From Swiss-Prot:
Gene3D superfamilies named among the record's database cross-references: 3.30.300.20, Ribosomal protein S3, C-terminal domain
A Pfam family it matches: Ribosomal_S3_C
Domain of life: Eukaryota
Keyword rRNA-binding included in the entry's annotation: yes
Keyword Protease: no
Entries under CDD domains matching the protein: KH-II_30S_S3 (cd02412)
InterPro entries named among the record's database cross-references: KH_dom-like_a/b, KH_sf_prok-type, Ribosomal_S3_C_sf, Ribosomal_uS3_bac-typ, Ribosomal_uS3_C, Ribosomal_uS3_CS
Coiled-coil features, chain-numbered ranges: none
GO cellular component: chloroplast; cytosolic small ribosomal subunit
The protein's name: Small ribosomal subunit protein uS3c
Domain named KH type-2: residues: 47-118
Location in the cell: Plastid, Chloroplast
Listed GO biological process terms: translation
């Protein structure tokens, strides 16, 4: 059987960069990873709760964490940051307070910055979240996958592959369904590939969503 490798880790240092930028001693490295996970989880939960009262679709492309001796800088890249930008600094301050409640550190300050993604439908995390919402609303998985491919045309991507695995449509036997449009050269290191894995809970069980996007070739 073919051996699969994560396309992001495969290209680190070539055309992909780390989303956590900090150094730590070997004994405290595990604690630093747990800190990052708590910060990311808290931000995602806050955005998901505010999605219900917001008219637009909110999607986090990625969260970058930079740690210094006295500062933790969090940069959130969001596709449609309506409730955070339209509310001025109030939305960002409220988010920062929520994160600080879970993250206690007397020696380091926490600073959160929001950046808008230029082409949100070229981000696999945002597209995976869109498919998850469609599946929860019992939309046909084929219709959801085709709609995602239509959305990526707005972002001028060179290729996309979408895969859904699990008990699709409530069938007794789990299976894998996928669709591809354009080129997705996973084995070419100079080809910049964005990838994400997303888990969604439906009434039939847990489904796994994977998306590969061919952005450009260097």
């Amino acid at each position: 059987m073919g051996q699969k490798i994560n396309p992001l880790g495969f290209r680190l240092g070539e055309n992909q960069s780390h989303h956590s930028l900090w150094f730590a001693q070997p004994k405290s490295y595990c604690r630093g990873l747990q800190e990052d996970e708590k910060i990311r989880d808290c931000i995602k939960i806050y955005v998901q709760k505010n999605m219900r009262i917001s008219s637009g679709f909110e999607g986090i492309a990625h969260i970058e964490i930079q740690k210094k001796m006295d500062l933790i800088q969090v940069i959130i890249s969001i596709g449609f940051p309506n409730f955070l930008i339209e509310g001025g600094t109030r939305g960002i301050e409220e988010l920062q307070m929520n994160v600080q409640k879970r993250f206690h550190s007397a020696n380091r300050r926490l600073n959160i910055a929001i950046t808008r993604v230029a082409k949100p439908y070229g981000q696999p995390n945002i597209l995976a979240e869109y498919i998850a919402r469609q599946l929860k609303n019992r939309v046909s998985f084929r219709k959801a996958m085709k709609k995602v491919i239509e959305l990526t045309e707005q972002a001028d991507t060179k290729g996309i592959q979408v895969q859904i695995a699990g008990r699709i449509d409530g069938k007794e036997i789990a299976r894998v369904e996928w669709i591809r449009e354009g080129r997705v050269p996973l084995q070419t290191i100079r080809a910049k590939i964005d990838h994400c894995s997303y888990t969604v809970r439906t009434i039939y069980g847990v489904l796994g969503i994977k998306i590969w996007i061919f952005v450009d070739e260097q």
